[in-house]
């Protein structure tokens, strides 16, 4: 998870970009922070998906084969 300070800085830069614009240094900082945020978000989403099992209305496991294989490989 991204630190509260980094999240606050992302929001601060977004507000400043809308109101008065960013300097080149601030724009680069914003891009780097956004990349880091997206990387953390994607990792969390991937971890969440690896804990998912899809069950149809009849109670059958219909989890996609590719996901099952990925889940098995993470266990070993």
Swiss-Prot record:
Keyword annotations: Cytoplasm
Region (Disordered): 54-76
Record-stated family: Belongs to the UPF0291 family.
Location, primary (coarse class): cytoplasm
GO cellular component: cytoplasm
Record field: compositional bias (Basic and acidic residues): 63-76
Cytoplasm is among the record's keywords: yes
UniProt keyword Acetylation present: no
Protein name: UPF0291 protein GWCH70_1239
InterPro entries xref list: DUF896
Annotated source species: Geobacillus sp. (strain WCH70)
Location relative to the cell: Cytoplasm
Pfam families reported for this sequence: DUF896
UniProt cross-references to SUPFAM superfamilies, sorted A to Z: YnzC-like
């Amino acid at each position: 998870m991204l630190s509260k300070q980094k999240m606050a800085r992302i929001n601060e830069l977004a507000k400043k970009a809308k109101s008065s614009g960013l300097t080149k240094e601030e724009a680069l900082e914003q891009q780097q922070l956004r990349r880091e945020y997206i990387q953390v978000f994607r990792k969390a989403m991937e971890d969440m998906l690896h804990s998912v099992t899809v069950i149809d209305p009849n109670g059958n496991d219909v989890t996609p084969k590719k996901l099952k294989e990925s889940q098995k490989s993470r266990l070993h």
